[in-house]
Amino acid sequence: MPSPGTVCSLLLFSMLWADLAMAGSSFLSPEHQKVQQRKESKKPPAKLQPRALEGLIHPEDTSQVEGAEDELEIRFNAPFDVGIKLSGAQYHQHGQALGKFLQDVLWEEADEVLADE
């Protein structure tokens, strides 16, 4: 007959092992994914509205913008997704600021990666 200390040790070990097994399986189990999908599906999808362009386009430029079908779309993936659509006139007006912003963001990420290595 095993001693009471051995029985208690085995019982404690089996309880800890069961807790560890349940913690790992609950995170990876398909049931957990289904619960997450239900929680996400209850939220209505967010609809983004573009900002008003009041004052950004001068009245003399409106004929040029209406006739221009050229649109520029910039997309890149970093730790987050970014997408920007601009007409030709908007790109001409805000292109330098946009370029500087993108350069600052991308170089900052590159500097952080180099510092981590």
UniProtKB/Swiss-Prot annotation:
Post-translational modification: O-octanoylated by GOAT/MBOAT4. O-octanoylation or O-decanoylation is essential for ghrelin activity. The O-decanoylated forms Ghrelin-27-C10 and Ghrelin-28-C10 differ in the length of the carbon backbone of the carboxylic acid bound to Ser-26. A small fraction of ghrelin, ghrelin-27-C10:1, ghrelin-27-C10:2, ghrelin-28-C8:1, ghrelin-28-C10:1, and ghrelin-28-C10:2, may be modified with singly or doubly unsaturated carboxylic acids. Amidation of Leu-98 is essential for obestatin activity.
Ranges of biased composition (kind: Basic and acidic residues): 31-43
Protein localization: Secreted
GO cellular component: extracellular space
Annotated GO MF terms: ghrelin receptor binding; growth hormone-releasing hormone activity; hormone activity
Lipid attachment residues per UniProt (O-decanoyl serine): S26
Keywords for this protein: Amidation, Hormone, Lipoprotein, Secreted, Signal
Leucine amide carried by residues: L98
TM helices/strands, residue ranges: none
Lipid linkage positions (O-octanoyl serine): S26
Domain of life: Eukaryota
First-listed, main subcellular location of the protein, grouped into a coarse class: secreted
Signal peptide region: 1-23
Lipidation (O-hexanoyl serine): S26
Protein name in UniProt: Appetite-regulating hormone
Gene: GHRL
